[in-house]
Protein backbone atom coordinates (compact mmCIF):
# COMPACT_ATOMS: atom_id res chain seq x y z
CA UNK A 1 0.00 0.00 0.00
CA UNK A 2 1.51 3.25 -1.21
CA UNK A 3 0.62 5.38 1.83
CA UNK A 4 1.99 3.05 4.50
CA UNK A 5 3.56 5.08 7.29
CA UNK A 6 1.96 8.34 6.17
CA UNK A 7 0.01 10.57 8.55
CA UNK A 8 -3.00 12.24 6.91
CA UNK A 9 -5.24 14.86 8.49
CA UNK A 10 -8.66 15.28 6.90
CA UNK A 11 -10.74 18.17 8.18
CA UNK A 12 -14.49 17.68 8.10
CA UNK A 13 -13.81 13.96 7.97
CA UNK A 14 -16.87 12.81 9.89
CA UNK A 15 -19.32 12.80 7.01
CA UNK A 16 -19.89 13.37 3.32
CA UNK A 17 -16.93 13.73 1.00
CA UNK A 18 -14.51 13.96 3.93
CA UNK A 19 -15.57 10.60 5.29
CA UNK A 20 -15.08 8.88 1.93
CA UNK A 21 -11.68 10.55 1.45
CA UNK A 22 -10.65 9.33 4.91
CA UNK A 23 -11.75 5.79 4.15
CA UNK A 24 -9.95 5.77 0.80
CA UNK A 25 -6.65 7.04 2.22
CA UNK A 26 -6.87 4.52 5.07
CA UNK A 27 -7.35 1.70 2.56
CA UNK A 28 -4.04 2.74 1.01
CA UNK A 29 -2.25 2.41 4.33
CA UNK A 30 -2.27 5.93 5.74
CA UNK A 31 -3.04 6.61 9.37
CA UNK A 32 -5.93 9.02 8.93
CA UNK A 33 -6.77 11.63 11.54
CA UNK A 34 -10.29 12.95 11.24
CA UNK A 35 -10.52 16.51 12.48
CA UNK A 36 -14.11 17.60 12.89
CA UNK A 37 -16.21 19.81 15.12
CA UNK A 38 -18.60 16.84 15.17
CA UNK A 39 -16.39 14.64 17.34
CA UNK A 40 -19.01 11.90 17.82
CA UNK A 41 -19.42 11.60 14.06
CA UNK A 42 -15.67 11.47 13.57
CA UNK A 43 -15.34 8.72 16.18
CA UNK A 44 -18.04 6.70 14.42
CA UNK A 45 -16.19 6.92 11.11
CA UNK A 46 -12.93 6.02 12.87
CA UNK A 47 -14.57 2.90 14.33
CA UNK A 48 -15.73 1.86 10.85
CA UNK A 49 -12.24 2.35 9.41
CA UNK A 50 -10.64 0.36 12.23
CA UNK A 51 -13.25 -2.35 11.76
CA UNK A 52 -11.92 -2.84 8.24
CA UNK A 53 -8.33 -3.01 9.46
CA UNK A 54 -7.37 0.60 8.86
CA UNK A 55 -5.52 3.03 11.10
CA UNK A 56 -7.52 6.04 12.23
CA UNK A 57 -8.11 8.46 15.07
CA UNK A 58 -10.43 11.38 15.74
CA UNK A 59 -9.82 14.86 17.10
CA UNK A 60 -12.29 17.61 17.81
CA UNK A 61 -11.37 20.55 15.62
CA UNK A 62 -12.85 23.96 14.93
CA UNK A 63 -10.87 24.97 11.86
CA UNK A 64 -11.79 28.64 12.31
CA UNK A 65 -9.96 28.75 15.65
CA UNK A 66 -6.21 29.36 15.41
CA UNK A 67 -5.70 27.96 18.91
CA UNK A 68 -7.66 24.81 18.07
CA UNK A 69 -5.72 24.25 14.85
CA UNK A 70 -2.33 24.73 16.48
CA UNK A 71 -3.29 22.39 19.33
CA UNK A 72 -4.28 19.64 16.90
CA UNK A 73 -1.08 19.93 14.86
CA UNK A 74 1.02 19.99 18.02
CA UNK A 75 -0.72 16.83 19.24
CA UNK A 76 -0.13 15.07 15.91
CA UNK A 77 3.62 15.66 16.00
CA UNK A 78 3.73 14.69 19.68
CA UNK A 79 1.75 11.44 19.31
CA UNK A 80 2.90 10.37 15.84
CA UNK A 81 5.24 12.41 13.65
CA UNK A 82 5.02 15.44 11.37
CA UNK A 83 1.96 15.30 9.15
CA UNK A 84 2.51 14.09 5.56
CA UNK A 85 -0.88 14.85 4.01
CA UNK A 86 -3.50 17.47 4.82
CA UNK A 87 -6.89 17.57 3.13
CA UNK A 88 -8.72 20.80 3.88
CA UNK A 89 -12.26 19.59 3.38
CA UNK A 90 -14.23 21.23 6.21
CA UNK A 91 -16.88 23.53 4.83
CA UNK A 92 -20.40 24.80 5.32
CA UNK A 93 -23.11 26.69 3.45
CA UNK A 94 -25.42 29.45 4.63
CA UNK A 95 -27.29 30.27 1.44
CA UNK A 96 -29.31 33.39 0.78
CA UNK A 97 -29.73 36.22 -1.68
CA UNK A 98 -26.98 38.81 -1.46
CA UNK A 99 -29.34 41.66 -0.56
CA UNK A 100 -30.76 39.63 2.32
CA UNK A 101 -27.62 37.89 3.51
CA UNK A 102 -26.73 38.49 7.14
CA UNK A 103 -23.20 39.53 7.98
CA UNK A 104 -22.95 36.68 10.48
CA UNK A 105 -23.66 34.16 7.69
CA UNK A 106 -21.04 35.75 5.44
CA UNK A 107 -18.45 35.69 8.20
CA UNK A 108 -19.22 32.12 9.29
CA UNK A 109 -18.81 30.66 5.80
CA UNK A 110 -15.62 32.60 5.06
CA UNK A 111 -14.14 31.74 8.45
CA UNK A 112 -14.67 28.01 8.09
CA UNK A 113 -14.22 27.52 4.35
CA UNK A 114 -11.33 29.90 3.69
CA UNK A 115 -9.74 30.98 6.96
CA UNK A 116 -9.85 27.39 8.20
CA UNK A 117 -7.89 26.19 5.19
CA UNK A 118 -5.37 29.00 5.70
CA UNK A 119 -4.85 28.11 9.37
CA UNK A 120 -4.46 24.38 8.69
CA UNK A 121 -2.20 24.91 5.68
CA UNK A 122 -0.02 27.28 7.68
CA UNK A 123 0.53 24.75 10.45
CA UNK A 124 0.98 21.92 7.95
CA UNK A 125 3.56 23.87 5.96
CA UNK A 126 5.62 24.53 9.10
CA UNK A 127 5.85 20.81 9.81
CA UNK A 128 6.31 19.76 6.19
CA UNK A 129 9.09 22.27 5.52
CA UNK A 130 11.24 20.65 8.19
CA UNK A 131 10.97 17.25 6.49
CA UNK A 132 11.04 18.78 2.97
CA UNK A 133 8.02 16.80 1.80
CA UNK A 134 4.26 16.79 2.05
CA UNK A 135 1.02 17.30 0.18
CA UNK A 136 -1.82 19.73 0.87
CA UNK A 137 -5.16 19.31 -0.89
CA UNK A 138 -7.84 21.99 -0.67
CA UNK A 139 -11.40 21.00 -1.50
CA UNK A 140 -12.80 23.91 -3.51
CA UNK A 141 -15.96 23.83 -5.64
CA UNK A 142 -17.31 24.41 -9.12
CA UNK A 143 -19.18 27.29 -7.50
CA UNK A 144 -15.87 29.01 -6.82
CA UNK A 145 -15.26 29.14 -10.57
CA UNK A 146 -18.70 29.82 -12.06
CA UNK A 147 -20.64 31.29 -9.13
CA UNK A 148 -24.12 30.20 -8.08
CA UNK A 149 -27.38 31.97 -7.36
CA UNK A 150 -27.87 32.52 -3.64
CA UNK A 151 -24.34 31.52 -2.69
CA UNK A 152 -22.32 34.73 -2.67
CA UNK A 153 -20.57 33.76 0.56
CA UNK A 154 -19.87 30.16 -0.46
CA UNK A 155 -18.73 31.20 -3.96
CA UNK A 156 -16.37 33.81 -2.52
CA UNK A 157 -14.91 31.33 -0.03
CA UNK A 158 -14.21 28.72 -2.69
CA UNK A 159 -12.89 31.21 -5.25
CA UNK A 160 -10.59 32.54 -2.55
CA UNK A 161 -9.48 29.01 -1.76
CA UNK A 162 -8.46 28.48 -5.38
CA UNK A 163 -6.33 31.63 -5.40
CA UNK A 164 -4.90 30.69 -2.02
CA UNK A 165 -3.93 27.23 -3.32
CA UNK A 166 -1.94 28.69 -6.21
CA UNK A 167 0.01 31.05 -3.96
CA UNK A 168 0.55 28.31 -1.39
CA UNK A 169 1.92 26.01 -4.11
CA UNK A 170 4.44 28.65 -5.23
CA UNK A 171 5.64 29.34 -1.70
CA UNK A 172 6.13 25.74 -0.56
CA UNK A 173 7.39 24.13 -3.78
CA UNK A 174 11.07 24.91 -3.06
CA UNK A 175 10.74 22.80 0.10
CA UNK A 176 9.41 19.77 -1.75
CA UNK A 177 5.77 20.33 -0.82
CA UNK A 178 2.91 20.16 -3.29
CA UNK A 179 -0.48 21.90 -3.05
CA UNK A 180 -3.48 21.40 -5.29
CA UNK A 181 -7.20 22.06 -5.23
CA UNK A 182 -10.02 19.72 -6.17
CA UNK A 183 -13.18 21.45 -7.36
CA UNK A 184 -16.15 19.09 -7.16
CA UNK A 185 -19.30 19.78 -9.09
CA UNK A 186 -22.64 18.77 -7.63
CA UNK A 187 -22.00 15.67 -5.55
CA UNK A 188 -24.63 13.36 -4.06
CA UNK A 189 -24.12 14.25 -0.38
CA UNK A 190 -26.16 15.68 2.47
CA UNK A 191 -25.79 19.13 0.89
CA UNK A 192 -27.54 18.12 -2.34
CA UNK A 193 -29.91 15.52 -0.93
CA UNK A 194 -31.96 18.30 0.69
CA UNK A 195 -32.71 19.82 -2.72
CA UNK A 196 -36.16 19.33 -4.18
CA UNK A 197 -36.44 16.60 -6.80
CA UNK A 198 -37.17 19.13 -9.55
CA UNK A 199 -34.05 21.12 -8.66
CA UNK A 200 -31.89 17.99 -8.72
CA UNK A 201 -33.32 17.02 -12.10
CA UNK A 202 -32.52 20.45 -13.54
CA UNK A 203 -28.98 20.17 -12.24
CA UNK A 204 -28.52 16.78 -13.87
CA UNK A 205 -29.76 18.19 -17.19
CA UNK A 206 -26.74 20.53 -17.14
CA UNK A 207 -24.24 17.70 -16.61
CA UNK A 208 -23.01 15.98 -19.81
CA UNK A 209 -22.41 12.71 -17.92
CA UNK A 210 -26.07 12.91 -16.82
CA UNK A 211 -25.65 12.19 -13.11
CA UNK A 212 -24.61 13.78 -9.86
CA UNK A 213 -21.11 12.91 -8.77
CA UNK A 214 -20.44 10.47 -5.97
CA UNK A 215 -18.12 11.20 -3.03
CA UNK A 216 -15.95 8.35 -4.32
CA UNK A 217 -15.32 10.34 -7.51
CA UNK A 218 -13.75 13.10 -5.44
CA UNK A 219 -11.90 10.71 -3.13
CA UNK A 220 -10.23 8.94 -6.05
CA UNK A 221 -8.99 12.28 -7.38
CA UNK A 222 -7.57 13.18 -3.97
CA UNK A 223 -5.90 9.78 -3.70
CA UNK A 224 -4.20 10.34 -7.05
CA UNK A 225 -3.01 13.83 -6.11
CA UNK A 226 -1.42 12.70 -2.84
CA UNK A 227 0.34 9.79 -4.54
CA UNK A 228 3.75 9.68 -6.20
CA UNK A 229 1.92 9.39 -9.53
CA UNK A 230 1.20 13.11 -9.15
CA UNK A 231 4.70 14.10 -8.02
CA UNK A 232 5.02 16.71 -10.81
CA UNK A 233 1.58 18.26 -10.28
CA UNK A 234 1.22 21.33 -8.07
CA UNK A 235 -0.75 24.57 -8.06
CA UNK A 236 -3.54 23.03 -10.10
CA UNK A 237 -7.32 22.99 -9.81
CA UNK A 238 -8.73 19.61 -10.80
CA UNK A 239 -12.40 19.75 -11.74
CA UNK A 240 -14.55 16.74 -10.85
CA UNK A 241 -17.90 17.78 -12.25
CA UNK A 242 -19.08 15.38 -14.95
CA UNK A 243 -18.38 17.98 -17.63
CA UNK A 244 -20.74 20.61 -16.20
CA UNK A 245 -17.91 23.12 -16.49
CA UNK A 246 -15.20 22.60 -19.09
Feature-to-residue mapping (PLM):
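Active-site helix of classical SDR
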Residues: 121, 157, 165
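Alpha-helical segment proximal to the catalytic Tyr-Lys
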Residues: 126, 170-174, 231
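Substrate-binding pocket helix/loop in short-chain dehydrogenase/reductase
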Residues: 97-98, 102-110, 192, 203
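Canonical Rossmann dinucleotide-binding motif of NAD(H)/NADP(H)-dependent dehydrogenases/reductases
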Residues: 2-33, 168
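C-terminal substrate-recognition "lid" of short-chain dehydrogenase/reductases
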Residues: 2, 121, 211-240, 244-245
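Residue(s) in the substrate-gating loop at a strand-loop-helix junction
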Residues: 141
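The beta1-alpha1 cofactor-binding region of Rossmann-like NAD(H)/NADP(H)-dependent oxidoreductases
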Residues: 39-40, 60-71, 103, 216-217
Amino acid sequence: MELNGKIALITGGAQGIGRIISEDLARQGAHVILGDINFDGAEKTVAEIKGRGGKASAVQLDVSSAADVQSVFDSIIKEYKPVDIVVNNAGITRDGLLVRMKEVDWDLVLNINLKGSFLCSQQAAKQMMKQKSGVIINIASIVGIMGNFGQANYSASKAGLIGFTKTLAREVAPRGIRANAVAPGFIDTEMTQVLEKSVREKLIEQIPLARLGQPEDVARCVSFLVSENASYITGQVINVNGGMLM
